Amino acid sequence: MKTAIFGFAGSGKTELFQALAGPGSEHNDRAMVKVPEPRLTPLVDLFKPKKVTPTEIEYLDLPGGSTKGEGLGQRVLNAVRPYDCLLAVLDHFSGLSDPDSQHRSIETDMIIADLAVVEKRLERIAQDKRKAKNLVDPKEESLLEQVQAVLEDEKPLRGDPDLSSRPELRGFCFLSAKPILYIWNVTEDNLEAEVTAEHAGEAHLAICAKLERELAEIEDPDEQQAFLEDLGIQASALKVIISKAYELLDLITFLTAGEKEVRAWAIPKG
């Protein structure tokens, strides 16, 4: 699973990336992170395999977008297209910007970018139709017109899963169709902050990236747990974000075991 982490300049996205990637990530923008899976341990004890392979998530820390209110910028929008899941970090700690407005700005940027892709393709189809009708796939044209209607209504495509999941549209890599997890980066004394109601294909979490980075620097698991308990946090951001990402992508973990290898696989639910 490939997840892109992005946000406006000063949102704290790099601090969150470092919390997820762990110690030694200060000079990197890409990390492979093992998915915690406690069910592997008894299987390893039973089979004593030569190899143990947990599931991994690739995180990419993208360059910061423009200043809040000026949009993400084309560079960021282009960079997130190949990724399976998006993780957008919203500033809810500085008091300089409203997270709801940041959320709306990100959604608007993605919708506009998708609309440009659709309009360009429909223009090409119209040109081909003028040359010869047999050059045009009427099914593709109809689907793109449906996509265009949703986007012109200023709605993200993920809100229409029946349309956005059509295999004929997969090659377009529409941004607003991608599952997205919004992280409200809060202060230490605002961990219980209320976040925006979730919409189809998106989720919202309140997390203090600064605290989570400090937690990631603690190597001893018992000390990590004591740190969480002192703060009244049930689970680390690493576990919570992975769990939410699996929900958004509709994935489950499947285990296989034998003397050669015990392995965890991320597979579609059902």
Predicted feature residues:
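Conserved Switch II/interswitch segment of TRAFAC-class P-loop GTPases
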Residues: A31-P36, P63-E70, R81-E140, V150-D162, ...
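Conserved G1/Walker A P-loop phosphate-binding module
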Residues: M1-S94
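Short, low-complexity, polar/charged sequence segments that are solvent-exposed and flexible
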Residues: K50-V52, V76-V80, S105-T108, A200-A203, ...
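C-terminal-of-GTPase-core extension/linker across diverse P-loop GTPases
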Residues: M1-F17, A21-G22, N28, R124-G270
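Short, exposed beta-strand "edge-strand" segments with a Pro/Gly-rich flavor and a Y/T-containing core
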Residues: T53-P54, L96, R213-I218
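Glycine-rich loops and low-complexity Gly/Arg-rich segments
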Residues: I57-Y59, Y83-D84, I112, L228-I233
